C-alpha cells in the first residue's frame, strides 16, 4: 500500500500571532529544537532526519495553515504529480527551488478546494547517528485535514499523489503512502480546516510523560490518553497556546500490500467509548472547536 510518488510527511507550516511565545512553548514544553530561523519565521526539528518538521511564521490573528509538505520519492515524481494534480482538478502554483532553509526542489499544488500541498525532493536531511532522546518527538506522524467532501478530497489524494485508502470510518478516511498506516487523514466535517498535527514519539512512555509535561504547563489533555482503532496508535491530544490541535502519538501500525481496508461497520465502539482503552479524557468542547478554526491561508506572502 505505498504511493509510487510520495514517501511521507515532512513538515507543516503555520502562522502564529506571537513567535517568541511559540518558540518558548515548542522548545521548552513540546520538546522540539530550533533548526533555523529567518525574519519572522522559526523552523523546528525533532530528533529524526528531517531538517525541520514545523515552520511557524509570525502573523496577526487566528493561526492559519500555510501548507503541508510531503516528500517525493524521486525528482521524476515531481513531474508526474504536476501533471496528475492538474488532471485531477488541482492547480500548480509554483515549481522550482525551495524557499525554506532545507533546500531541495519543490512543487506547490492546490487541490480543488484550496488546500495547499508542497512536495519536496532533495531537501537536506540530518545524519541519524545520535541516541533518540526519550521524550522528544522524532518526526511528524500524520496530519488530519477536515473536508466538507471527503470522497472528492480522497479521490484527489489518490489520483494526484498516489495515496491509498487504508481504512474508512464513519467520520474519517485514513490515507496511506508508505509503511505507516496513515500519513494523511480526511475528517468528514462541514469545513476544510486543519484538524490536527500528530508528532511521533519514540515510545508509549514518551506519550504519557509528554502528557504530564503539558499538564504541568497548564495544558491538560483534551482527548486521551488512549489508543485508536484505525492505525492502532497511542495518543494524547492537546490545544497549544494559540489554538492549534497537536497530538503526541506512538506505536502506529505498520502495514503492507496485504492489509485490507476496513469499512465504517468494521470500526464501531461500545456506548460511551471511542478508542480501544476507554480510560482517558473524552474529546472536550475546546478540542472540537479548535479542530475547526485553523484554515488554509488564502494566499501565501
Where are these regions (language model features)?
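Conserved short beta-strand elements that form part of the metal-binding/catalytic scaffold
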Residues: 32-65, 115-123, 166-195, 200-204, ...
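Core segments of cupin and vicinal oxygen chelate
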Residues: 4-51, 99, 145-182, 187
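Active-site-adjacent scaffolding segments
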Residues: 41-52, 57-143, 172-173
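N-terminal beta-strand motif that seeds the catalytic metal site of vicinal oxygen chelate
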Residues: 1-20, 65-70, 122-151, 164, ...
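A short, polar/proline- and glycine-enriched secondary-structure boundary/capping micro-motif
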Residues: 33, 66, 129-131, 257-260
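Vicinal oxygen chelate
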Residues: 15-20, 69-113, 148-151, 199-246, ...
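Internal, well-ordered alpha-helical scaffold/interface segments
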Residues: 151, 155, 159, 173, ...
Amino acid at each position: 500500500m505505498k504511493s509510487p510518488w510520495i514517501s511521507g510527511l515532512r513538515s507543516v507550516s503555520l502562522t502564529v500571532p506571537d513567535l517568541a511565545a511559540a518558540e518558548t512553548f515548542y522548545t521548552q514544553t513540546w520538546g522540539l529544537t530550533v533548526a533555523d530561523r529567518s525574519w519572522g519565521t522559526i523552523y523546528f526539528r525533532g530528533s529524526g532526519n528531517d531538517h525541520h518538521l514545523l515552520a511557524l511564521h509570525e502573523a496577526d490573528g487566528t493561526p492559519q495553515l500555510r501548507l503541508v509538505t510531503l516528500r517525493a520519492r524521486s525528482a521524476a515524481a515531481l513531474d508526474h504529480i504536476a501533471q496528475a494534480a492538474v488532471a485531477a482538478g488541482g492547480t500548480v502554483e509554483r515549481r522550482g527551488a525551495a524557499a525554506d532553509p532545507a533546500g531541495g526542489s519543490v512543487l506547490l499544488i492546490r487541490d480543488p478546494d484550496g488546500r495547499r500541498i508542497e512536495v519536496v525532493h532533495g531537501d537536506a536531511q540530518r545524519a541519524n547517528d545520535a541516541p533518540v532522546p526519550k521524550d522528544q518527538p522524532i518526526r511528524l506522524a500524520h496530519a488530519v485535514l477536515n473536508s466538507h467532501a471527503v470522497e472528492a478530497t480522497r479521490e484527489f489524494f489518490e489520483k494526484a499523489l498516489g495515496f491509498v485508502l487504508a481504512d474508512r470510518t464513519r467520520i474519517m478516511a485514513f490515507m496511506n503512502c508508505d509503511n505507516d498506516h496513515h500519513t494523511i487523514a480526511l475528517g468528514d466535517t462541514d469545513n476544510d480546516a486543519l484538524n490536527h498535527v500528530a508528532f511521533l514519539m519514540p515510545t508509549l512512555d514518551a506519550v504519557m510523560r509528554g502528557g504530564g509535561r503539558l499538564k504541568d504547563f497548564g495544558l491538560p489533555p483534551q482527548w486521551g490518553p488512549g489508543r485508536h482503532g484505525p492505525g492502532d496508535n497511542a495518543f494524547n491530544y492537546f490545544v497549544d497556546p494559540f489554538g492549534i490541535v497537536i497530538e503526541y502519538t506512538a506505536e502506529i501500525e505498520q502495514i503492507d500490500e496485504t492489509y485490507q481496508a476496513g469499512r465504517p461497520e468494521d470500526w464501531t465502539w461500545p456506548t460511551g467509548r471511542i478508542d480501544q482503552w476507554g480510560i482517558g479524557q473524552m474529546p472536550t468542547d475546546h478540542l472540537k472547536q479548535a479542530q475547526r478554526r485553523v484554515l488554509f491561508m488564502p494566499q501565501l506572502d
